[in-house]
Amino acid sequence: MYSQIRTSMLDGICAMPVQVEVDISMGMPVFDMVGYLSPEVREGKERVRTALHNCGILLPAKRITVNLSPANIRKTGTGFDLPIAVALLVAMGLVKPEKCADTIFSGELNLSGQLLPVRGILPMVSDGVKEGIHKFVVPADNLMESRLVQGADVCGFSALESVIGYLQDGGYKEPAYAGRRQNRSHGMPDFSEVNGQQFLKRAAEIAASGMHNMLMVGPPGAGKTMISERMATILPPLTKKEQLEVSKIYSVCGLLADSRTLLQERPFRSPHHTVSMAGLAGGGRSIRPGEISLAHHGVLFLDELPEFSKSTMEVLRQPLEEHQIHLTRAVGSVTYPSDFLLLASMNPCNCGYYPDRNRCRCTQASLQRYFDRISQPLIDRMDLCVEAPMVTYEELTGNGNNESSKTIRDRVCECQERQIFRFKDEIFSHNSGIPAAKLNQFCRLGEKEQRYMEKMFHKLSLTARTYHKILRVARTIADTQKAENIRVCDLTEAVCYRSIGDKFWGGMEE
């Protein structure tokens, strides 16, 4: 007898439909599984056989063939256990085929027949609904995550026996804990906690307003990390579409901590400088998302930038330009989104006190080696390069009457709304994404402003790339002041955010 059941597998943060076919025919008693299977999928036949046995169901002494279609795509993951078991039950005549029609099954089985959660259930359900499938059967631990998708009729079960009962008589009892929500409360860091560093705070607001990448250079204890950790709190709230995109990525990684709601806060990722290329960009045997994808629609902070390996930092070049990462391995290729705001910090030298020669003991050669660790193309992709001086005693012990993150966020939201309206007919939505070909359209300069930039171009020996970055940042500065056109004062401030190149790199500008 033949049966067919719907399921799906992950392809990046999307779901690919898979058909589980079972044929039971006369012949030597054998249980074969075909369809380009990974080891964990192939091992599933023993989990399924034993789980059915412990539910009181014995497989017939016949030739059993299980095919996972399409056969040209490698199947990975443990979510095929449940659909294989259901397909066997249908083929054995224990469940009517119409009970499983237009339903997607997914779940892992243990030997006792208990259903275990699987990664990536959110994109599986979301893409299933897009394809017109609205009924899903999943493990109970994945139930709330599945119900985040509108239009999905999801049933969650904790054991295979419960699934069999549901398919045979249609009875469904909601798991006892399905309606409960975790009570999670935690205090978010706030900009009001940062004393001093007004120049650095201003640069951070501009970076957030235009989604400009920023590098901070300063001695230890200057507040670079404190400001970076609070950067996500001044970005606009995630839209519903962005919440779903970010939640899909975290679901694929099994990191959706509270499965009763989509992620509400913008991600903040700060990998250690020993992170591998696969850890940063993604990859591994099963091609998982890396830190740059986990920071999608949020902030990626690289503390102590020169301590990262040069090969690891080079991985950032493509995502910074294309806002996505293409990963290719022997088992296949996937694309993960990676549209993030990059923040990086570093000391000015190995000891941290250059150019203060009273405290710095680094030689000129060691200084050169220190800055040579950083890729020039990566530096070129930083829109703002800001110096963070030491905080004075007066600033540190002041009354602490600092602006809160909410106050700054309100200004950032207003600034970004101006950009979204301006670029409503374009494929980009922030000033940092203005292509060079459209700078004259969106960053038009008056005669006085042109004369100023011509003077700065020759005085600072600017490259075309740096000149364009200054215009984009100046456009954001003008937006923060609600100015229709770029003014000389906007250009002057934008130039200041590129002025540390000569101080620390000398010939940083190409």
Put a short name on every predicted segment.
Residues 1-215, 219-225, 328, 466-467, ...:
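Peripheral, non-AAA+ core regions of ATP-driven protein-machinery
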Residues 112, 302-309, 352:
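Catalytic P-loop NTPase motifs of RecA-like helicase/translocase cores
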Residues 37-45, 60, 67-77, 287, ...:
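Basic, amphipathic alpha-helical bundle interface domains used for macromolecular binding and assembly
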Residues 297, 303-304, 315:
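Walker B catalytic acidic pair
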Residues 216-257:
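Walker A/P-loop
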Residues 205, 262, 267, 278-300, ...:
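Conserved alpha-helical scaffold flanking the Walker A/P-loop in AAA+ ATPase domains
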Residues 242-276, 283-284, 389, 429-438, ...:
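Conserved inter-motif catalytic segment of the P-loop NTP-binding fold
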Residues 18-24, 280, 383-386:
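Short beta-strand elements
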